[in-house]
Amino acid sequence: MKSKLKLLSLAAGIALALSGTSVLAAGKYDVGANDKEVKVGNIVPYSGPASAYGNIGKAIAAYFKGVNEQGGINGRQINFISLDDGYSPPKTVEQARKLVEQEKVLFLAATLGTPTNTAIHKYMNKKKVPHIFVNTGAHKWGDYGTYPWTMGLQPDYQTEGKIYAAHILKNNPNAKIAILYQNDDYGKDYVKGMEDGLGDKKGMIVAKASYETTDPTVSNQMATLKGSGADTFFNVTTPKWAAQAIKGAAELGWKPTHYLNSVSSSVGSVMVPAGAENGIGVISSNYFK
């Protein structure tokens, strides 16, 4: 239910941005808009290791279908063009160029992923095409001075990491923490947030292990982290690997206090494949906007 509400809020936010666009009201248009339609671009992983997030693109498309059936926005139909990048940065670049240079969209909205959006960050700003509601919480999306055409969406990952750190310090000040994280800006932002939140207690982190998005499993990393003697586990992953980590901990007989980042707090994409019984006691967070 929470995920559905967030998706609806995201789609409604895009619609609100369109309804408030002055160029539509004035009859003077930028590329991607005219009297009949507005082209909105989107890139999500419908395939590949992060395909669980493909539902985001499908949900937004369904929302705009309903909007169009009710007359559109300011009398214009929304042509929502959503392309698959397989969670591969080079493919994201290819798809962004297609949307901007061939489809000539008014803007990109809700494009998903830290490594994928990073790949098109400079390109979108150079082209001066709005890159809005970036669907990732990386800290870099707040650099409006350098990248004025990019706007983030969700609470940043460093802040979320600090929240978990505060919870650990309050509830288990002698914890031994092990961290599994994705080896890119996405994962590293969470690790930094945890370290900053622990402050002079960051020595509580006794082990870290990273994985690449091309890795088939994280079984070796989980065995290493268990072997560290940690009693607290910070699981900084995307759904595929989050499910593996939860299930892997159970198979190893490792029962730490388990913190799971909000990105992977999904029942259908994570808890079901991990085994619901293995997810009992997992601590996570969520947000509404």
What are these regions (language model features)?
Residues 1-39, 69:
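Short, low-complexity disordered leader/linker segments with a strong preference
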Residues 26-28, 37, 52-58, 70-143, ...:
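Beta-alpha junction/loop-to-helix N-cap segments that form part of ligand/metal-binding clefts
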Residues 36-55, 176-180:
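Short beta-strand segments enriched in small/hydrophobic residues
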Residues 43-46, 83-86, 110-113, 134-137, ...:
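Active-site-proximal beta-strand/loop segments in catalytic clefts of secreted hydrolases
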Residues 49-59, 185-189:
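Glycine- and acidic-residue-enriched helix-capping/strand-helix junction motifs
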Residues 67-74, 127-129, 198-204, 250-256, ...:
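Short helix-capping segments at alpha-helix termini
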Residues 91-94, 139-142, 148-253:
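Extracellular/periplasmic Venus flytrap/periplasmic-binding protein
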Residues 249-289:
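Extracellular/periplasmic periplasmic-binding protein-like sensory domains
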